[in-house]
Swiss-Prot record:
Testis-specific. The modification Phosphotyrosine is found at Y239. It catalyses: (S)-lactate + NAD(+) = pyruvate + NADH + H(+). There is a cross-link at K57 (Glycyl lysine isopeptide (Lys-Gly) (interchain with G-Cter in SUMO2)). PROSITE patterns: L_LDH (PS00064). One of its GO terms (molecular function) is L-lactate dehydrogenase activity. NAD(+) binds at residues 29-57, 99, 138. It comes from Homo sapiens (Human). Belongs to the LDH/MDH superfamily. LDH family. This is L-lactate dehydrogenase A-like 6A. The modification N6-succinyllysine is found at K5, K118, K318. The modification Phosphothreonine is found at T309, T322. The active site is at H193 (proton acceptor). The modification N6-acetyllysine is found at K5, K57, K81, K118, K232, K243, K318.
Length: 332
């Protein structure tokens, strides 16, 4: 019996789908779904895969996304509880984990999420042994270390979203004070994605003009303009959003899409992301924290050797020590 499809379409050649930019997102909570939307809007993937243990929510989110396909050039979107669906991914983004509670620091989350990673990582590496891993789950620096150890991947292919968002917040707050768009404000936050992060005031500039040349005490407690409050807002804003709306999602998802674009398009842009930092700035342990990295199709290809002041380097070492105090107690 003839069907509409057979009457409409004549097969011309057999084809086998080959996905060059397959992205898998593990976890369809508020962050995972926001990452999916941000990546779809940038048109970065030719197949997007969603994985979650909550099958009902997973199917609902997948259908909701699929039904928007007429409004954008949407790739194939598939989902499953089974990690087989992630096979041959170019990039796997991990957002799954226990949600941060009100008043809970990112470091308090760690042991609850380590056990979740022990279930996820072996499944991911089994089906996508050549993928890059982008870790988003908090505490992101320690869990990027956990993913590196559990996966056995080379260090360049295990990346934490780290301080890419912190640096964006930093630039935004600087821009708000100066009346300049954040894109034109250049500055980095390094170290832990969290309370011990380090603002690199010595490198903050607008159009190549270092703000430290205009105010040598910028960012210190001697600064009459109290620019240190900018960094305090970077740290507190995440907690404030969790208190007000229960979670954060849009800022981090746009940050993840930004990192994804650099990786899949081999842009070799510089991002402050979490990577193995042993041997840098006097750090002697296998600590993952954010330093400026060049991102491309092989993950982290190079690091930028930023010259820090003695005070900034001391703060970075203290940030590493903060992470090490937790990390050394982990049971992998």
């Amino acid at each position: 019996m003839a069907t509409i499809k057979s009457e409409l379409i004549k097969n011309f050649a057999e084809e086998e789908a080959i996905h060059h930019n397959k992205i898998s997102i593990v976890g369809t909570g508020s962050v995972g779904v926001a990452c999916a939307i941000s990546i779809l809007l940038k048109g970065l993937s030719d197949e997007l895969v969603l994985v979650d243990v909550d099958e009902g929510k997973l199917k609902g989110e997948t259908m909701d996304l699929q039904h928007g396909s007429p409004f954008m050039k949407m790739p194939n979107i598939v989902s499953s509880k089974d990690y087989l669906v992630t096979a041959n991914s170019n990039l796997v983004i991990i957002t799954a984990g226990a949600r941060q509670k009100k008043g809970e620091t990112r470091l308090d989350l760690v042991q609850r999420n380590v056990s979740i990673f022990k279930l996820m990582i072996p499944n991911i590496t089994q089906y996508s042994p050549h993928c890059k891993l982008l870790i988003v789950t908090n505490p992101v620096d320690i869990l990027t270390y956990v993913a590196w150890k559990l996966s056995g991947f080379p260090k360049n292919r295990v990346i934490g979203s780290g301080c890419n968002l912190d640096s964006a917040r930093f630039r935004y707050f600087i821009g708000q004070r100066l009346g300049i768009h954040s894109e034109s404000c250049h500055g980095l936050i390094l170290g832990e994605h969290g309370d011990s992060s380090v603002p690199v005031w010595s490198g903050v500039n607008i159009a190549g003009v270092p703000l430290k040349d205009l105010n040598p005490d910028i960012g210190t407690d001697k600064d009459p303009e109290q620019w240190e409050n900018v960094h305090k807002k970077v740290i507190s804003s995440g907690y404030e959003m969790v208190k007000m709306k229960g979670y954060t999602s849009w800022g981090i998802s746009l940050s993840v899409a930004d990192l994804t674009e650099s990786i899949l398009k081999n842009l070799r842009r510089v991002h402050p992301v979490s990577t193995l930092s042993k041997g840098l700035y006097g750090i002697n342990e296998d600590i993952f924290l954010s330093v400026p990295c060049i991102l491309g199709e092989n993950g982290i290809t190079d690091l930028i050797k930023v010259k820090l002041t003695l005070e900034e380097e001391a703060c970075l070492q203290k940030s590493a020590e903060t992470l090490w105090e937790i990390q050394k107690e982990l049971k992998l």
